[in-house]
């Protein structure tokens, strides 16, 4: 049995279509979807329809699915969330609401567990591999897969929390996303798989539609990481023609920077905006439209030098 594992699509329909086509061309029998399907790219509604139509698929919900129910506000910070939720039909929202936070099943004697975040299984053991930290560890260039996987394994090896959690976990496969970086590691009878982010890969490598294939045969598991390069600038040009770009320009521009660099930008922009708001005595949170946009102009101008 071969599973295509896809996570963190974030409304990026072109990336999802590339991943699905590649998975089917490589003989995928079923799909495992690990959450965060909408918001950040403008095609969340089409993404949901595509996911609902997938044959032999299991889905869990991510943290972004919770934000879709935020009351519509007049702030700048959540403009993209408000816009994204308005694009979804009632039946799509209901489908997302019904998704479980965690699933498990057995295949050929192997127990497979899936949740959106690794915290469901190993606590904060992988926290040092969060996107903002990766951007600091690998500030420029493309990190090789060999180096990235070795660094990830070293982080887990050196984590007391990880080894404590490992003692409590039943043997099997553990699948999760959320951190937007693709990796897998085997520790004895435990196999951990993060398929990365299909829609916004932040693992300091090439821009690509990212997902992972898991094959289970006669109780044995093999993993193949898949990365399908495509044109970031062409995608950006397409997004600029959508309503989202005008409704949530600042957030969308930051996503463009993430696509161009394959590194976290949102975290650093939010830190910048917090400092900017404090400097002008603005205590409103979420940030107002005026503060949000002025902070972005300052951020953009600073990045030019």
Regions found by a protein language model. Give the residues of each.
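A contiguous binding-surface segment within folded domains or other stable secondary-structure elements
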Residues: 132-139, 145-215
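Beta-strand-turn-beta hairpins that frame and shape the catalytic cleft
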Residues: 1-4, 104-113, 187-192, 221-222
